[in-house]
Amino acid sequence: MIDSEALESERVKLKRDIADLRANLNRKEQCLRELEAAIAAGEDSDEAEESSNDMPTPQTKLTNDDIARYSRQLILQDFGVQGQLKLKNSSVLIVGMGGLGCPAAQYLVAAGCGHLGLIDYDEVERSNLHRQILHSEHRCGMSKAESARIALLELNSHCQIRCHSRLINSMNAMHIIRPYDVVLDCSDNVATRYLLNDACVMLRKPLVSGSALKMDGQLTVYGYGQGPCYRCIYPVPPPPEAVTNCGDGGVLGAVTGIIGAMQALEAIKVIIGLGDVMSGRLLIFDGSSFMFRNIRIRTKRPNCHVCSAQPLITELIDYEMFCGMHATDKDNPLDLLEPDQRLEVKEYHQKLQSQPHLLLDVRPPAEFEICQLPRSINVPLSEILDDSYLKRFAKQLEDKELPIVLLCRRGNDSQIAVQHITNRFPAHSIRDLVGGLHAWTGSVDATFPIY
């Protein structure tokens, strides 16, 4: 007898594999085009990317095209010709071509920034497109930096754009940052924030920092004038378990657009000396109530380890070790449980699924609504940690023979939940599904949605 469900799962898996192959082909073809362009220009592509030589000779006048293109900002009293020339001769480095970096780059290029550097180690995915507005469906699988450059050059072909399709780290940060006038931190992860802060302090570069999560955003400028640096405000990194990224907490695309656009504005103000730069202050945006708050933050810390008169840190360190987390926005897989407390999705599917058991999905209700396994019961991790689940499952918990299986999106929160319940009921058989729903899609049912 033909198993139609298995055939459909295999069909979907093959289509997904073909899409991945096409994306990889697009990426390889783009790399080939870049290499051929570099060869045609008589330069080695790696040298073009890595070069720390000075930027081209400053321009002393605007062209007719400049005047026509930028006329609406040229007529601003505090901007004018000199402001446009400063912008034309400026160089800005954007770290992270995601939800913040895309709108920031778009507005800087549109305004006439002469030289732009783009850093991103990652590739475009469909889950990026709702907020990373420079990328497109047909460029999924391509380097984010390269994808952004294509879109930006369509907007303004006069801008010189240099791509760094790699992870910025302690080994390359000083070399990459040195040629630029201003740096935008659009990375939105803690380890990279400390890295960029320290490098910018050592190189005396202003750092325009933005962040966005859920419906909220923040913006400030570090290391500008007599203002504080990031370490002045946060001398010690937060514990890893207290940090939430947009992959877990979610974010509304328009919020990243607002913060990214304001980062571009602050960069322009720094470059041309316009207005009151957001240094020594923090802008907090609440998208749910659409309220902006502008609060004053502490001044420079006299004993700051980086920006004080006698700094303790004079060279870049291992920031992943310092922060206890990776310098990316990817989820770090936890390893909290013993092997006998973990259950592979294939084993669950083949053996346990048909037997009596209790399957608890510890994701938030909004995520449970997106998709769920049959017969799973939604018990958010927050309910487990505050023990409010005990009343709901008192009878099941009395039965020590009833297996309890916990799952989540990627297999991290379920481990935390297993630890907590096991401490309460050590005699019970309580296990988590390794890899969560992502593993279920990859190993059992390719038609199950991934988010």
Curated annotation (Swiss-Prot):
Function: Plays a central role in 2-thiolation of mcm(5)S(2)U at tRNA wobble positions of cytosolic tRNA(Lys), tRNA(Glu) and tRNA(Gln). Also essential during biosynthesis of the molybdenum cofactor. Acts by mediating the C-terminal thiocarboxylation of sulfur carriers URM1 and MOCS2A. Its N-terminus first activates URM1 and MOCS2A as acyl-adenylates (-COAMP), then the persulfide sulfur on the catalytic cysteine is transferred to URM1 and MOCS2A to form thiocarboxylation (-COSH) of their C-terminus.
Identification of the protein by name: Adenylyltransferase and sulfurtransferase MOCS3-2
PANTHER family: ADENYLYLTRANSFERASE AND SULFURTRANSFERASE MOCS3, UBIQUITIN-ACTIVATING ENZYME E1
InterPro entries recorded: MOCS3/Uba4, Rhodanese-like_dom, Rhodanese-like_dom_sf, ThiF/MoeB/HesA, ThiF_NAD_FAD-bd, Ubiquitin-activating_enz
Cofactor note: Binds 1 zinc ion per subunit.
Species: Drosophila pseudoobscura pseudoobscura (Fruit fly)
Biased composition (Acidic residues): 43-52
Pathway: tRNA modification; 5-methoxycarbonylmethyl-2-thiouridine-tRNA biosynthesis; Cofactor biosynthesis; molybdopterin biosynthesis
Domain Rhodanese: 353-449
Catalytic residues as annotated in Swiss-Prot or TrEMBL: 246 (glycyl thioester intermediate), 408 (cysteine persulfide intermediate)
Entry-annotated residues carrying Phosphothreonine: 60
Binding site for ATP: 99, 120, 127-131, 144, 188-189
EC class: transferase
Record keyword Nucleotide-binding present: yes
Listed cofactors: Zn(2+)
